[in-house]
Amino acid sequence: MIKKIAIIMAFDFGTKKIGIAIGQKITGTTQSLEILPSKFGIPNWKKIEHIFNVWKPNKLIVGLPLKMNGNTQHITLLSKRFAVQLTHRFKITVEMHDERFTTIEARSIYFQHFRYYYRKKTTPIDSIAAEIILKSWLNQND
């Protein structure tokens, strides 16, 4: 029996930017894609739809931003709302995945590789964070 290739797309949702990454479940490979602007937590749905149609993922993962103690915060509710909107728009399974420490890890990874080019406003931290979320999800769901 031939397994269907599972393409998974992950989002690091923010009120100003949304990082996107793509991955493949069988090989476990991941790749950060791009960062889309978000105005007051409202995503650019046309761009998300375009990326969705290009990659045709089988599943979506949205980072779940919890406080360090595991409690929810305002951005947690906005991320959950974003996940529900993705489900309704694309008629696809969306899972939430704990994203604590991903931004810190993304900054560390970026700085290690590109320390001479590090500029806080121009770094792809959000898409790297989305890739970390996806890698974590793949590791827990292999």
From Swiss-Prot:
GO biological process: rRNA 5'-end processing
Matching CDD domains: YqgF
Residues in coiled coil: none
Record carries keyword Ribosomal protein: no
First-tier enzyme category under EC: hydrolase
Localisation: Cytoplasm
E.C. no: 3.1.-.-
InterPro entries documented for this protein: RNaseH-like_sf (IPR012337), YqgF (IPR005227), YqgF/RNaseH-like_dom (IPR006641), YqgF/RNaseH-like_dom_sf (IPR037027)
Annotated GO CC locations: cytosol
Keywords: Cytoplasm, Hydrolase, Nuclease, Ribosome biogenesis
GO molecular function, one term: nuclease activity
SUPFAM superfamilies: Ribonuclease H-like
Function noted in UniProt: Could be a nuclease involved in processing of the 5'-end of pre-16S rRNA.
Family: Belongs to the YqgF nuclease family.
The protein's name in its UniProt record: Putative pre-16S rRNA nuclease
